[in-house]
C-alpha cells in the first residue's frame, strides 16, 4: 500500500466540489498494472468531468485525467515489467476509472503501451490524446499506401 495525492471531484447539492486528497493504492480499481504517474495532460473531457457535466463521468467521487504517462511499479502481466515506461490514453481512464490527475493509476494491461523510443513522459503528454489520435490516422493512411504528393 502506498499513499498518494489525487485531484478529487465530488457531487454536491450545489454542483461539484474540488479538492486534493490523499488516497491509497489499495483504493484503486482492479488491473494488472500499477503506474506511478509522471505526467498527465489537459483535455476537454477532463474539464467536462471536473465540472460534473453528464456524458463523461457517471461515477463520483472521481479523479479525472484521460491521459497518463509514467513508470510501472507493479505488474501481474507478462508483457510489462516493473520499471517499464508506459503511456495510457483512452478507454475509461479519467472518465469512470481513477485518472491521471492522481500520482498513481491502476489499469488493465491492454490499456497501456510501452513508451516509444525517443519519446519521454513529458513529451508524450504534451502530445496527449488529440495528438495521438491524429498520429494514428496519419499512420493508417501511410499503411494504406498514400503518399504525400
Task: Map each language-model feature to its residues.
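Short polar catalytic/cofactor-binding loops
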Residues: 10-14, 40-42
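NAD(P)H dinucleotide-binding glycine-rich loop of Rossmann-like/cofactor-binding domains
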Residues: 89-149
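Cytochrome P450 core scaffold surrounding the K-helix E-X-X-R motif
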Residues: 45-51
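Glycine-rich beta-strand-centered segment in the early N-terminal region that forms part
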Residues: 26-42, 53-93, 116
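Short beta-strand or tight-loop elements
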Residues: 2, 19-21, 68
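Short glycine/threonine/proline-enriched tight-turn/helix- or strand-capping micro-motif at secondary-structure
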Residues: 14-24, 53
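Short structural boundary motif marking the start of a folded domain
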Residues: 2-7, 33
